[in-house]
């Protein structure tokens, strides 16, 4: 008889019992335990201007602005290759105009 009770308790619950109520799907109050355990949200706009972790410790202060903003020091990430190409062209021009110590001696 005791065996029958255990089997009755472990049976699959009825289909009505599995359906969630509207209150369970959309609770009216936030779960405070979930709020305490979750890390604070980091928004993409903050990450763009602040960077990740200790990255900013190695960069000069001109790079602290948001990337891609008006008058910002860095272009948006999708322009990085084009930006490097144009920067390199200017660097090559400066290099040609500046004579080295060897050229002066010749």
Curated annotation (Swiss-Prot):
Composition skew (Basic and acidic residues), residue ranges: 1-27
Disulfide bonds, paired cysteine numbers: none
Superkingdom per UniProt: Viruses
Record localization: Host cytoplasm; Host nucleus
A cellular component term, taken from the record's GO annotations: host cell nucleus
Keyword Phosphoprotein (UniProt): yes
Region (Disordered), start-end ranges: 1-40
Keyword Cytoplasm recorded: no
GO BP terms, alphabetized: symbiont-mediated arrest of host cell cycle during G2/M transition
PTM text: Phosphorylated by host ERK. The phosphorylation triggers a structural change that enhances keratin binding and protein stability.
Keywords: Early protein, Host cytoplasm, Host G2/M cell cycle arrest by virus, Host nucleus, Host-virus interaction, Modulation of host cell cycle by virus, Phosphoprotein
Residue spans of biased composition, Low complexity class: 28-37
Similarity field: Belongs to the papillomaviridae E4 protein family.
Quaternary assembly: Assembles into oligomeric complexes. Interacts with host CDK1. Interacts with host SRPK1; this interaction may favor expression of late viral transcripts. Interacts with host cytokeratin components KRT8 and KRT18.
Entry function: Contributes to multiple aspects of the viral life cycle including viral genome amplification, suppression of suprabasal cell differentiation and egress of newly formed virions. Induces host cell cycle arrest at the G2 phase by associating with and preventing the nuclear entry of host CDK1/cyclin B1 complexes. Inhibits cellular DNA replication by preventing loading of host replication licensing proteins MCM2 and MCM7 onto chromatin. Within the cytoplasm, associates with host kinase SRPK1, a splicing factor regulator, and inhibits its activity.
Other remarks on this protein: The major E4 form is first synthesized as an E1^E4 fusion protein from spliced E1^E4 transcripts, such that the first few amino acids of the E4 protein are derived from the N terminus of E1.
Official protein name in the record: Probable protein E4
Organism: Bos taurus papillomavirus 2 (Bovine papillomavirus 2)
Upper classification of the organism: Viruses, Monodnaviria, Shotokuvirae, Cossaviricota, Papovaviricetes
Gene that produces this protein: E4
